[in-house]
Amino acid sequence: TRLSRYLSPPLFPVLIRDLPCKLTLHEIANSKFSIGPFKIQSGYVIHPGPTVGFRVGNGKSVFTYIPDHEPALGEKGIIPDKRWISGYDLAAGADLLLHDAQYTATEYLSKKGWGHSSINDAALFASLASAKHVLFAHHDPFHSDAQLNDMFTVFKNENPYPFKNELAKEGMLINLD
């Protein structure tokens, strides 16, 4: 499987068959299924390689996970019509949305089509989807923590979105009902 190729040397130090667990893999793109009390919807999102986002709900709250996503459509940017926005159905009304925000708006100009989002496009996507709380993730590995904090401060000062938004950080815990 594709996952077996990624979870093997040289990309990953351990072979998938050597993991200390009973692992069952399923193809789940563009599907709906349940695991215990959780209803899960998966769907392809715009990215050069096959990439899936997830919507997980428990009847009380919804968490949407879209880590690799470019919602803008080239020079047109984000078309504010939910029928044309990749990932919209996954993110609509989410209580918590974790979304790709790898670039600043300026950096994104030279990286269109790479499959990642600017923080500005991620915020616009979240706003159009009426997400309540957004975690900006998939930070550019060339940005230091200090640079990320500075970039986020500039973004917040220039973009007063009505939803709660913050940078995703290692070790964060967020409670959903």
Regions found by a protein language model. Name each.
Residues T1-G77, G87-Y88, D145-D177:
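Binuclear metal-dependent hydrolase catalytic cores
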Residues A72-K164, A168:
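Cap/insert and terminal regions of metallo-dependent hydrolase folds
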